[in-house]
Amino acid sequence: MQRPIIAIPMGDPAGVGPEIVVKALANEEMYRIARPLVIGDAGVLRQAMAFCGLELAVHTVTEPAMGKFEPGVIDLIDLANVELKQLKMGAVQAMAGNAAYECIEKSVSLAMAGQVDAIATTPINKEALKAAGIPHIGHTEILGHLSGANDPLTMFQVFELRVFFLSRHVSLRKACDMVTTERALDYLVRCTEALRRLGVDSPKFAVAGLNPHSGEHGLFGDEEDEQIAPAIAAARERGINVVGPVPADSVFYFGLKGAYDAILSLYHDQGHIATKMVDFERTVAVTNGLPFLRTSVDHGTAFDIAGSGKASSVSMEEAIKLAVRYAPSFRRY
């Protein structure tokens, strides 16, 4: 089987994105399993190599088919969109935000055209995007906008623990208000379809509880009885294999041990804490509901260490590996 082509947008050039890209691609294993193609700026990549003490060749191409895809060589579609003399490492800049956006935009164009098999993204900075006038708050929103996808789903995976999120970047108070029967049912249907597109044909789901001990039949809250349980019952009527609500202090442990194929977390930090405590560096984000496969590192731009060469590339390597794992079975719309 031919190795999949994985597009890697370099991320915010003022952050650690370029450094983790060159570090990951210095690992020959990435070339044994994939054909990595970086979308970015040649000067930024060479600077990142200098930060990390690496010497790799940069082979610029205009389309994926021109890549060499061999160890020691970084194949790059050079957008030449960063003025290095003006770039300040570890700082929010409109130029950096615009460059990061253009890298994502090009990667999506390649994926939509079927020229790459997946995208593995690197960190971007929301403030830099805002400074550049980009009207989207993060990767998921940008990818949805560029591909025309409505409300893409975020899934975290660490080892065999997969976690979906009923809500993302909203306050905890608002997240509780978003726990409704209608929303939970909609997400169970969509999450099931998302896993099937990744090759998990008959997934078993668990829904996490919201309150302590899943509410103890109304003693500590009634969302489980009044909202979640009816959603689970309705999902079962549609043929979805789902259990719950399972108390949040145990459901993720059982998921890690293989009791479920995926868990629906009811708010952002509930699932984030669970996955990152298993292994912070090896937690990978997967965006479902797009017309292409996208994985991502699960950390930010780390401005505090940008330019030091200290950033770990483990999450980048794991994002590439997971893209390779799902690419053969991924089903487009």
UniProtKB/Swiss-Prot annotation:
Substrate binds at residues 139-140, 276, 294. It comes from the Bacteria. Its EC number is 1.1.1.409. The keyword RNA-binding does not apply. Its cofactor is a divalent metal cation. Catalyzes the NAD-dependent oxidation and subsequent decarboxylation of D-erythronate 4-phosphate to produce dihydroxyacetone phosphate (DHAP). Can also use D-threonate 4-phosphate as substrate. Homodimer. PANTHER family: 4-HYDROXYTHREONINE-4-PHOSPHATE DEHYDROGENASE, D-THREONATE 4-PHOSPHATE DEHYDROGENASE. This is D-erythronate 4-phosphate dehydrogenase. The lineage of its organism: Bacteria, Bacillati, Bacillota, Clostridia, Eubacteriales.
